[in-house]
Amino acid sequence: MGGTFDPIHHGHLVAASEVAAKFGLDEVVFVPTGQPWQKMSKKVSEPEHRYLMTVIATASNPRFTVSRVDVDRPGPTYTIDTLRDLRTQRPDADLFFITGADAMAQILSWKNIDELWSLAHFVGVTRPGHVLDGMGRKDVSLLEVPAMAISSTDCRTRVAAGNPVWYLVPDGVVQYIAKYGLYAGHADPGPSAALTELHEPASTE
């Protein structure tokens, strides 16, 4: 499951669980983007912060893992590079790329689109009532997930306004956001400090 995860919220987790159940997936790999090319002009939290929040959010589910392939790769993040790396790591796996409705709506503008179709089956998750075009392709599936009404943008806005995000994001992520002053204009000690204090492993894979 690819995404900025800035921050990861319960909508992401429910969507991943629903897709895993529907398609009988053995594992869901969360892949936080490094430098998302679509958001180069927008402020995005440091990759290590987003990676660690994803690790915290997924730790209790044995079917969920987190990959650093995009975080560790220099330069802008493109899905084609993500899928190539995952294919190299899992040559015998049937890959499903799970992403949100907003990303699926732009998929035809993505880099190396023809190769993308050959590398994975794409699953677009959306909130009920949101119309999403499956482009008539057998390798694209659409799935409505009620919890996708939660958005990372709304979570960031709430934090910036001093409003709570409990029950929108996992408890550990709420505490992480508060500890490092994310989204509230507080001083950010940086991802290296976060790594040192949390003692997280370099990778969960």
Swiss-Prot record:
Top EC class for this record: transferase
SUPFAM superfamilies according to UniProt: Nucleotidylyl transferase (SSF52374)
A GO MF term: ATP binding
Lineage top rank: taxon: Bacteria
Annotated catalysed reactions: nicotinate beta-D-ribonucleotide + ATP + H(+) = deamido-NAD(+) + diphosphate
Enzyme Commission number, as recorded: 2.7.7.18
InterPro entries, per the entry: Cyt_trans-like, NadD/NMNAT, Rossmann-like_a/b/a_fold
GO BP annotation list: NAD biosynthetic process
Involved pathway(s): Cofactor biosynthesis; NAD(+) biosynthesis; deamido-NAD(+) from nicotinate D-ribonucleotide: step 1/1
Keywords on record: ATP-binding, NAD, Nucleotide-binding, Nucleotidyltransferase, Pyridine nucleotide biosynthesis, Transferase
Entry annotated with the keyword NAD: yes
Pfam families: CTP_transf_like
PANTHER family: NICOTINATE-NUCLEOTIDE ADENYLYLTRANSFERASE-RELATED, PHOSPHOPANTETHEINE ADENYLYLTRANSFERASE
Family per record: Belongs to the NadD family.
Function of the molecule: Catalyzes the reversible adenylation of nicotinate mononucleotide (NaMN) to nicotinic acid adenine dinucleotide (NaAD).
The protein's name: Probable nicotinate-nucleotide adenylyltransferase
Organism (species): Arthrobacter sp. (strain FB24)
